[in-house]
């Protein structure tokens, strides 16, 4: 089976996350997309120190009506910093016969050279780079760290980098929904509407649990 992997803090999960997952699922004919909430992101502090369990629950609610969407608590169970390489190695071992498509924003891909064991990631999965507002990738080959650029062949017409492992890096435009989790947190803190920014079930959960009311 072809499985998409979408990681993030999901603080909170919002409609742009869901739309990205759906467009990648449709574009690459994925059997399912697995959402992987980060326990402790290594590149930025978790705003408000919202617990893993609360963020996990919001993702559960958000994807409940889509049978192609699943969730994994692999990073919560592992503890420590949530490095992508560790997660991908774990999933590769757990599902050795499946093919993974790791979904990342263009802003993250442009910074991939700073990730732990970044070069090894290309040996474990395909990567789908989704353009984000303000972080366009003009050419995938130019975005690669110099140290590993020789491991790829670039097919401009397909917007695809073929890696020597047999996996590829793809670039897609997607629907640019400029929705920010930090903006949603601030709106919720102020008691303003977050309707249509998050799924209704997540909106109700945030209100009922008063998740962001204390400016966490």
Swiss-Prot record:
Q: Which GO terms describe its molecular function?
A: ATP binding; nicotinate-nucleotide adenylyltransferase activity
Enzyme category, top tier:
transferase
Q: In which pathway does it act?
A: Cofactor biosynthesis; NAD(+) biosynthesis; deamido-NAD(+) from nicotinate D-ribonucleotide: step 1/1
Kindly give the InterPro entries that the UniProt entry links to this protein: Cyt_trans-like (IPR004821), NadD/NMNAT (IPR005248), Rossmann-like_a/b/a_fold (IPR014729)
What is the annotated signal peptide range for this record?
A: none
Report the EC number(s), separated by commas if there are several: 2.7.7.18
Output one GO BP term. NAD biosynthetic process
Cited Pfam families: CTP_transf_like
Q: What does this protein do?
A: Catalyzes the reversible adenylation of nicotinate mononucleotide (NaMN) to nicotinic acid adenine dinucleotide (NaAD).
Q: Which family does it belong to?
A: Belongs to the NadD family.
What this protein is called in its record is Probable nicotinate-nucleotide adenylyltransferase
Species in which this protein is naturally found: Geotalea uraniireducens (strain Rf4) (Geobacter uraniireducens)
Q: What is the lineage of its organism?
A: Bacteria, Pseudomonadati, Thermodesulfobacteriota, Desulfuromonadia, Geobacterales
